[in-house]
Structures are given as C-alpha cells and as structure tokens.
Swiss-Prot record:
Entry protein name: Glutamyl-tRNA(Gln) amidotransferase subunit A
InterPro entries per the UniProt record, alphabetical: Amidase, Amidase_CS, Amidase_dom, AS_sf, GatA
Reaction catalysis annotation: L-glutamyl-tRNA(Gln) + L-glutamine + ATP + H2O = L-glutaminyl-tRNA(Gln) + L-glutamate + ADP + phosphate + H(+)
Domain of life the protein comes from: Bacteria
Signal peptide range: none
Keywords from the UniProt entry: ATP-binding, Ligase, Nucleotide-binding, Protein biosynthesis
Pfam entry (one): Amidase
Subunit note: Heterotrimer of A, B and C subunits.
Role summary: Allows the formation of correctly charged Gln-tRNA(Gln) through the transamidation of misacylated Glu-tRNA(Gln) in organisms which lack glutaminyl-tRNA synthetase. The reaction takes place in the presence of glutamine and ATP through an activated gamma-phospho-Glu-tRNA(Gln).
Assigned GO CC terms: glutamyl-tRNA(Gln) amidotransferase complex
Any GO molecular function: ATP binding
Length: 489
C-alpha cells in the first residue's frame, strides 16, 4: 500500500488493525512526506524521527490492540502542549531550552491510545496571533500556496495535517486558533466546550478561554481523536466530570439533516466578509437545506463587541500567566545582569516577542486599579451578554452556522505591520470562546478568486460536540472534496 499519508486517520487505523500496514510503515511514510514538504512549509519545530520509529517497531512486535483506538497512528502536537523528553517552547525564545519531564493530559491520552507522536508543531508565540508569523523561530507557510499564511495560532498543526505529514494533530483554541487555521488550510478543526478536555500540561495564554482540540482531514477523524482526549482530569479544576459521549456512534446514527434547525446570524454575514467566502459558505447552507435542514435566522447582537471584550480578558489573563517567565526560575536568562531588576527586564525583553509584550502591557493596564472598572469589569459584563445571546439563539435552533474567517489566507507579511487589522481576522471566532461553547470548522470549497480553502463553522450548545460532529459529517460528505494542496503538487 503506497502513499499512506493520503489516507484518512480512520482508514490507516483500520489498515493497521488488519495488519495490512505496519506501524513502522506508517511512520516511515509520514517521515518521508515531512522530508519532502517541510522545507516548503516549515510546520514543525521539533521532530522525533528516531524515537517514533522505535515506538512503531515496539508496537509492531506486540501486535495490534483493539482496546487502543489510535494504535500505530502517527500524529503531531502543537508546541504549547508539554511532551516528556521533547522540547516544548510555545513558539517562544524564552522557553527555547525547556524540556518537560511530563506529558500534558491530552498527549498522555494520545500515547495511551497507541498514537505515535512524530513531532511538535510551530505556532504563534504563546498562541498570540492569527498567522503563525509571530513564532520566534520561523513563519509557517500554507500548503495550498506557500506565499500565504496558514492562519494561527495553530498554523503549524493545520499545515501538517493539510500537507499529509501526519494523520491528526492537536491544536489549541483561545479565540479561534483551531478553527481559523483549519479553515485557511482546508482541514477540519474542533474546538471543544470549555472543560471538555483537561488543560493540564497546556502552556497557558488565557486560562478561562483556552481549550485543546483535534485537527484532522475528515470529521470522522476528528470524532475519533475527540473520543480519546475528552474526559475528566482531577489535575485541572475546570475540567468537567461528566461522561464522554460515543462520538463515532453519533456519526453513524445520522444519515441526513432532516429535523435539524441551522441558525444563521446576520452578524456573521455582513460588512467585511469577502464575496468569495460568502459564496462558498452560502453554497454549503444550500447543501444543508437539500439534506433536509431548516435554515432559520438568529441574532448574536454583541458580536461586534466581542473583539474588544476578548482582547481585554485574554490580555489580562496573559499578563498574569506570563509573569512567571522572569529569568529566575526557568526559561531564558539574560547574560551577566547588573542586578535583579536588570535580570527581569532583559530576560523578558530578549525572550518575549513584540506581540506578546504588547498583550502583556495591555493586560497589565486593564487590570490596574485606575482602569479595572472602565475596561476589565465592562469586558466581563459583555462576556455575560454574549453567552446570553447564544442561549437565546439556541432556543430556536440546534446549531449555528457562519464563516470562520472573513477572508481566505492572505500573503505572508501583509498584516504584520497592522496588528489591529490582524485582530479583525478573528471577528467570527472570538465570541464562542468567551461563551465557552464548542465549534467545528470544516472545508466547504475553494475561493473563486484566490483558489484558497474556505471554511464554515458549526457552533453548538455546551457539551454537545456529538451534534456538531454528526451534522458536520453529513454536510461534509455532501460537499465536493478539495483535493490535494496546490502548493505541494
């Protein structure tokens, strides 16, 4: 069986279970694909080639294990998640030499399920960015056009999946960082409900917003990975202690969209939405209607305020979370400081990038005694209103549907000098994180002007990932496949 990297995760998993393919063959095929594509897309920061081959050989020697749903499947992980014995930098120079001794909960779950971790994916520094150009090490390029961005902050993960370097990757979503790069790279990305997946071992950006989720090539694959990483973990006090649904069974039980009410908020379809994105997304809605869905209008009136509220809340939490990187306990340490203050200032100035410093300063400002009420308290009030908007909308629909990004992938460097314009790229994704609800991004076509992937997002009720996945699976199967990335042909 040749070109294994072109298979879905479900297909390679089944081939491995039947011993039609060895785990070592799957790993070697992905490593060969990485060797071919990595010089063009720069999706990886750390590669575990030798370790992955050894792990695959050990699995082959033991034989397939039906109790391990990812047995022998090669995957990658965003570099914000700790991996025992493998560097974890969060895309930052300040953690350049950090090698953790423990796995993040989600990584631990992958290993227990039999997955083989090939490497760690590039990302915007501390997950602060929308293009993966804020990485301290290198920008990642979009496999569909290597002159364009892959999105962010999980751009490395999206690029790896789209390029066939792995069968799945774990990303993180604080304000759209799974869904947006999935949309721009033409793959599937699931942002779970806040608390569905433990954040233990995740290098924090915004602790009340961060969530870990799968990035794959099909909705079925996302359901498989989600079933592995979801679950309670007592080491994360925000992790929900509730049963995990059988997501695969949810997919199998739905064959059309009869009886499904899809809400369409006008706020997601107005000014700023490019015509090619609107065209592709409306075609997907037409396909949903043909499958039996009922399209209803809903309102999310506080969507315009979500950008300001998000950047106040997220920056405030980041300023607290990143205070620990001071050059004293761990991380980059300035050389020959004159005194303690010089150590602090130089370690952080040299170790943290411009965007991270910008958000730390913003967060410190909005939390200061003179401005807390004017900014942070108001942002918290807007956040509650946004959650109320979603609750009201779900009174009349089962899922909400809209574009992920107002535009397709833009050229590298086009927005780096204009951070405010970059922030606007997340206008359709931020509110979901503020509400703590789940969202699924899936590709719906290629832009008529740019030829780049367009994604649509399905938004759901709290802990109702099963509905999102089952609806998304039916819809995605009815849409024409995108084909292989044009930039790598």
């Amino acid at each position: 069986m040749s070109a294994l990297h072109t298979l879905s995760l479900a297909a390679i998993r089944d081939a491995l279970a039947r011993r039609e393919v060895r785990a070592e063959d799957a790993v070697l095929d992905c490593l060969a694909r990485i060797e071919t594509t990595e010089p063009r897309i720069d999706a990886l920061l750390h590669l575990r080639a030798e370790a992955a081959i050894e792990e695959a050989r050990a699995l082959d020697a033991a034989g397939p294990d039906a109790s391990r749903p990812l047995w022998g499947v090669p995957v990658t992980v965003k570099d914000a998640l700790t991996t025992a014995g493998t560097p974890t930098t969060a895309g930052s120079r300040i953690l350049e030499d950090f090698v953790p001794f423990y796995d993040a909960f989600a990584v631990q779950r992958l290993r227990e399920a039999g997955a083989i971790i090939l490497g760690k994916n590039n990302m915007d520094e501390f997950a602060m960015g929308s293009s993966t150009e804020n990485s301290a090490y290198k920008p990642t390029r979009n496999p569909w056009d290597t002159a364009r961005v892959p999105g962010g902050s999980s751009g490395g993960s999206a690029a790896s999946v789209a390029a066939g370097q792995c069968f799945a990757s774990l990303g993180t979503d604080t304000g759209g960082s799974i869904r947006q790069p999935a949309s721009l790279c033409g793959c599937v990305g699931l942002k779970p409900t806040y608390g569905r997946v433990s954040r233990y071992g995740l290098i924090a950006y915004g602790s009340s917003l961060d969530q870990i989720g799968p990035m794959t090539r099909t909705v079925e694959d996302a359901a498989i990975v989600m079933g592995v990483i979801a679950g309670h973990d007592k080491r994360d006090s925000t992790c929900a202690d509730r049963p995990v649904e059988d997501f695969a069974a949810a997919l199998a039980s739905r064959h059309d969209l009869a009886g499904v009410r899809i809400g369409v908020p006008a706020e997601f379809w107005g000014e700023g939405l490019s015509p090619e994105v609107a065209t592709s997304c409306r075609a997907a809605l037409d396909a949903a209607r043909d499958l039996g869905a009922t399209i209803v209008d809903v309102a999310l009136p506080h969507t315009p305020q979500s950008i300001a509220a998000y950047y106040i809340v997220a920056s405030a939490e980041a300023s607290s979370n990143l205070a620990r990187y001071d050059g004293v306990r761990y991380g980059k340490r300035a050389h020959a400081p004159e005194d303690l203050m010089d150590l602090y200032v130089r370690s952080r100035s040299e170790g943290l990038g411009d965007e991270v410093q910008r958000r730390i300063m913003l967060g410190t400002y909005v939390l200061s005694s003179g401005y807390y009420d004017a900014y942070y308290r108001k942002a918290a009030q807007v956040r509650r209103r946004i959650l109320e908007d979603y609750r009201n909308a779900f009174a009349t629909c089962d899922v909400i549907c809209g574009p992920v990004s107002p535009v397709t992938a833009w050229p590298l460097g086009a927005l780096t000098a204009d951070p405010l314009q970059m922030y606007l790229m997340d206008v359709f994704t931020l509110s979901l994180n503020l509400a703590g609800l789940p969202g699924l991004s899936l590709p719906v076509g290629l832009g008529t002007e740019s030829g780049m992937p367009v994604g649509i997002q399905l938004l759901g009720r709290s802990f109702d990932e099963a509905t999102l996945l089952s609806v998304g699976n039916v819809l995605s199967r009815a849409l024409p496949p995108l084909g292989s990335p044009a930039g790598l042909r």
